[in-house]
Amino acid sequence: VADDVPAIAICLGAQVAAEALGGSTAVPALGNDEVGVVELTITAAGESDPVFGAVAAEAIRAAHRAGIRTSDGTRFPVIVSHHDAVTHLPEAAILLASSDRSPVHTWRAGRLLAFQHHPESDPARVAYWRTRDALNDLAGTMDAASLKAARDALEVAAGRSAAPGAAGTHGATAADLPEAAASAGAAAREEAERVDPAIQAFGRTLARVLVRNVRA
């Protein structure tokens, strides 16, 4: 920031950047944690930001075309997965967007642009996160062998292991996932697929704007 170098910080990166610049975070951020799809509300500074404003506007247009609500062009969906959060911005930072549950979401400090959400994510990853969290919630009700088989099955389903029976998975399959965890992941994926046009528009536009700014 002090050297005026353009940079992007995402999720944990945004939290680390906030701490480094004099802000504060909560670990864990009880009441501010989020997983799945949430709506961001853009601030006036966000609308006029040379990067975020243009990217958010394109995401909102894509949402409108897909029939996704935008609350008169002030809100759009993003994908999140965080249990920690920035609670106070650095003094020099400007808030660009908030969610209902997590007030500090997108912000800028100099040429650093920080996102609490994951612009690079997709429905498959959302399903993985939500299934993983559901498994963690169920861990106390499962024996060690069943829990390991379920976690192995999740890794196989997510493509993090080559195939059932790959090293370390011991032949785990989708049948080893508890129904509650599998259902949670499926519901999260369905919700993410519904808003995917806006998610993809945000990611593509962000990439184009960043490349254009670097070349300028």
Q: Where are each of the predicted segments found?
A:
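Flexible gly/pro-rich beta->alpha loop and the following alpha-helix that scaffold active-site loops
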Residues: 1-9
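Generic, well-ordered alpha-helical segments
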Residues: 8-9, 32, 194, 198
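Gly/Ala-rich beta-loop-alpha elbow adjacent to hydrolase catalytic centers
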Residues: 9, 13, 18
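Hydrophobic aliphatic residues
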Residues: 20-21, 130
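A broad structural signal for alpha-helix termini and local helix breaks/kinks
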Residues: 21-22, 214
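Pocket-forming structural segment of enzyme catalytic cores
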Residues: 22-125
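Acyltransferase
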Residues: 120-216
